[in-house]
Structures are given as C-alpha cells and as structure tokens.
C-alpha cells in the first residue's frame, strides 16, 4: 500500500530509517548515521504542510518499507522545482517499489505545478540512475563537490513518460 505522509507519521518514518542498513543510510544521507532524529522524522511527516509532499510505502505487516519526500527549493531559477529524496527498505530493493514511489511523486508534483525535480546524491549512484532509466524520464546530472552530483528531472518535458 502507498499513501501520503500524515503529521503523526514521524515515529514510523524514524523507525524505517533506523532499520535501513549502513550502506543504504550512507547513500541517503551522505554519511554514517544510525537513523534520523525525532525532529527530522517530524519534518518528513509534515512535508505536505510546507508545500511539498511525502509518500510512504507500507508493507503487509504495517511497517514502512519505502519513503519519498518532495521539498520545495527556495529561490530556484527557471520555475518551480522540488528536491526529491527516496529510500527503499534493503530487502525490497530491485522489485519496483522505488519506481512506484517516484511515479507517484511525479504525478503529485505535476498536480501542484512543479516543473522539475532535483536530487543530490553520491556520484555514480547506480540504483538511482537505473530507477530514472526505468521510469523513462529525461534527466541530466552535474557534478558538485567531489563525491556528489545533482540530477534534474524536467517534468514538463516528460508529460507522456509517466501515467
């Protein structure tokens, strides 16, 4: 099941990130961490109240198995853009859950008039690159500081790519 985040979801989101393996957390947060704190979890849970969106994938046991967050980018040039970040439970990777989350996020962003999604990631993040290729979205990547890159997905150019 997939649904939008709600203000009371902070503890479930924190638990999800605590259950991710070290490599997954490193890819998501660019460093060693054991999870996220209560404040960050509540921030993720309230994404919709700040003009963005958030999605949770819920497993059959009721636990969060995927999270995607869309946050408005302050002062972006060239139109309205949002930062996108996604994480999928280690044992659920490679089964299409990330694609489902990203496609739902793209539909949400388009409904809200967002023109582009941007993400910062570790350079050469093959799973994210593969996810973008599977979704059929036009995207471009640009290096940032050593070890990091940013990608941009132009939503207006990909209106027919995602149903």
Spans of features found by a protein language model:
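Long, contiguous binding/interaction regions
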Residues: 1-163
């Amino acid at each position: 099941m997939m649904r939008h985040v709600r203000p009371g979801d902070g503890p479930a989101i924190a638990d999800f990130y605590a259950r991710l393996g070290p490599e997954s957390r490193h890819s998501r947060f660019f460093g060693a961490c054991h999870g996220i704190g209560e404040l960050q979890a509540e921030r993720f849970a309230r994404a919709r109240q700040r003009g963005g969106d958030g999605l949770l994938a819920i497993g059959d046991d009721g636990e969060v198995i995927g999270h995607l967050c869309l946050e408005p980018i302050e002062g972006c040039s060239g139109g309205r853009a949002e930062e996108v970040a996604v994480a999928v439970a280690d044992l659920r990777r490679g089964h299409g859950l990330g694609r489902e989350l990203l496609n739902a996020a793209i539909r949400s962003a388009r409904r809200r008039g967002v023109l582009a999604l941007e993400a910062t990631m570790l350079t050469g993040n093959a799973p994210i690159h593969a996810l973008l290729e599977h979704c059929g979205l036009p995207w471009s990547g640009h290096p940032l500081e050593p070890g990091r890159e940013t990608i941009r997905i132009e939503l207006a150019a990909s209106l027919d790519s995602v149903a």
